[in-house]
Amino acid sequence: MQPRRPDRFDGLEYRGTSWGRGEGDPPPYQSSFPARSFSSSGDLSQHWVTTPPDIPGSRNLHWGDKSPQYGGADSNAGPPAFGEENSNSANSGEQLNRFAGFGIGLASLFTENVLAHPCIVLRRQCQVNYHARNYQLSPFNIVNIMYNFTKTQGLRALWKGMGSTFIVQGISLGAEGILSEFTHLPRELNHKWNPKQIGGHLLLKGLVYVIVTPFYSASLIETVQSEIIHDNPGILDCLKEGMGRVLNLGVPYSKRLLPLLVLTFPTVLHGILHYIVSSTVQKCVLFFIKKKSPPRLPADGSNTVQNKLEDYFPELIANFAASLCADVLLYPLETVLHRLHIQGTRTIIDNTDLGHEVVPINTQYEGLKDCINTIKREEGGLGFYKGFGAVVVQYTLHAIVLQITKIIYSSVVQTSS
């Protein structure tokens, strides 16, 4: 039986009144509602009909059905709304994004500062050891020396001076920020650079290296001195020794100690050249990687980790190649720089030929030029590359860690998708 459809519905005869046609006053029971003006046209498309209130569960019911109540046992949970699905996928993608970024950054920080430090210790000890007959150019010799040091002095001997290297990095970053604020020299170069900006940026870097020079010298001493003779230095000894070097206070040094003015030029030269080479190589590697990689479409939340890998790993590879090229090209200058810094400090280092015993450092260089000529005359051209095998070991470990990190996160992508 079909329900009888009314012949006419004008909102409970609302339009039949004179007020509905805009001709009279509103009835008393509607005086509290705002007045609305309606045209007197009889077009049904202009009729105003109020909708019933939205009663939960009252939609799509058949004859005799009851409206289900909220929280009832018989109510079935419907599928999530479209916005809810997007928000859930966005939240999971955000978590994967943070996890990927944190993990990749932590792996890079661990590799560059912790895992590479034993190689830096061995490299510096070989560079300043002018007594050495074995130049340690092979990575296998470096591994053998590491084993001998560990057997005689323990694992601590391979990570000595690591705290002072962090202090030097902190001083460098702090000095760069303060100088940039007061001198308005650019800390970074944008894409639309000009020669004036490059000059100001390199000037800022040079001023930072001038400030860091005494603390770098103190950190170098902590890195190369033997654990057999000296006690383990404190965390702030680097700051104390650096300030003592500036103010001519603290432990008396030898007369062969070079003044800071003599050490400043090679330190600034090495720092600026290292920065220029590494920045140039990094930009070139990133350019070629992005040029060869295909354009990427916007991905869903399941591919956020893969996208993060594609964003981060080209930068890590570029940083790896930049540091490698800069260290290899400037290795001879670094050898000269370290010998100038260590001269006259009465430092006793480990014997890198045997892996045990100690040897003193008693050089008499007069400056940068004299040091270069003396090394060339007494040790030959390969004397500038003493300890180069440590560079091979360092960057081999770095490459292995990068590859392992990439494999781990690729497996995470496959399991999450």
Curated annotation (Swiss-Prot):
Disulphide linkage map: none
Solcar repeats (start-end): 95-186, 310-415
Function text: May play a role in mitochondrial dynamics by controlling mitochondrial membrane fission.
Keyword presence, Plastid: no
Organism of this sequence: Xenopus laevis (African clawed frog)
Gene3D superfamilies according to UniProt: Mitochondrial carrier domain
Cellular location(s): Mitochondrion outer membrane
Biased amino acid composition, Basic and acidic residues: 1-13
One Gene Ontology term from the biological process aspect of the record: axon development
Family: Belongs to the mitochondrial carrier (TC 2.A.29) family.
InterPro entries membership: Mitochondrial_sb/sol_carrier, Mt_carrier_dom_sf, SLC25A46
Residues passing through the membrane, by range: 102-122, 162-182, 198-218, 257-277, 313-333, 382-402
Residue ranges, compositional bias (Low complexity): 31-41
Presence of keyword Chloroplast: no
Alphabetic keyword roster: Membrane, Mitochondrion, Mitochondrion outer membrane, Repeat, Transmembrane, Transmembrane helix, Transport
UniProt protein name: Solute carrier family 25 member 46-A
Pfam annotation, one family: Mito_carr
Position of the signal peptide: none
Chain positions covered by the region annotation Disordered: 1-90
GO cellular component, as recorded: mitochondrial outer membrane
Membrane topology classification: Multi-pass membrane protein
